[in-house]
């Protein structure tokens, strides 16, 4: 039995479009430019909209009768609309039982439609508040994550500083050479007489002195590593 194929929740992007946005085309500046912003009007779901239209248009501009006053409490009006929808729905059921062909059936349908339009309109007026609240919560989550990351980093930093301080405190003032450390020759070196070679003598002496200093530093570092481990 083969492995189950993963199905994407979104449709596959059109290949004739995405193939133009390769890394090479983007690097060479050959990728298509984004479309220009719409300035006048646009079509959406078969309706024409103006760019300067309000996000939530008043009911009067849509030719819909307003059932609630201009100044109102959204919570109270939503509850009133919910109760009105319930009462009209029960009336609709009673009409369908007693006289299905009555003209009152169409009237109740229009009443229910108007009530639902008002309820959706009042809910949509909460969308800007919902967007601001969602953004606020998202920023609070990001802030909390960054503070937690900074706190963990500070703890690791303090731990590293403490380890370094403990290592420095454990080091003696006079570092002795361990048994496995590199031994340094203490015998005097044979230095040629200046009369035999005027140029090689000082250079060889300087090189030997530098080598001896390097060996001392290497030996001290070996001692430090041995004590840490």
Swiss-Prot record:
The entry's cellular-component GO terms read: mediator complex
Q: Which InterPro entries match?
A: Immune_Mod/Transcr_Coactivator, Med7/Med21-like, Mediatior_Med7, Mediatior_Med7_sf
- Compartments in which it is found: Nucleus
User: What domain of life?
Assistant: Eukaryota
| Alphabetic keyword roster | Activator, Nucleus, Transcription, Transcription regulation
Q: Which GO terms describe its molecular function?
A: transcription coregulator activity
Q: What is its main location?
A: nucleus
Any one biological process term the GO annotation gives:
regulation of transcription by RNA polymerase II
Subunit composition and interactions: Component of the Mediator complex.
- Family in the record: Belongs to the Mediator complex subunit 7 family.
List the PANTHER family hit by this protein, alphabetically: MEDIATOR OF RNA POLYMERASE II TRANSCRIPTION SUBUNIT 7, T-CELL IMMUNOGLOBULIN AND MUCIN DOMAIN CONTAINING TIM
Q: What does this protein do?
A: Component of the Mediator complex, a coactivator involved in the regulated transcription of nearly all RNA polymerase II-dependent genes. Mediator functions as a bridge to convey information from gene-specific regulatory proteins to the basal RNA polymerase II transcription machinery. Mediator is recruited to promoters by direct interactions with regulatory proteins and serves as a scaffold for the assembly of a functional preinitiation complex with RNA polymerase II and the general transcription factors.
Name of the molecule in the record: Mediator of RNA polymerase II transcription subunit 7
State the gene name recorded for this protein.
med7
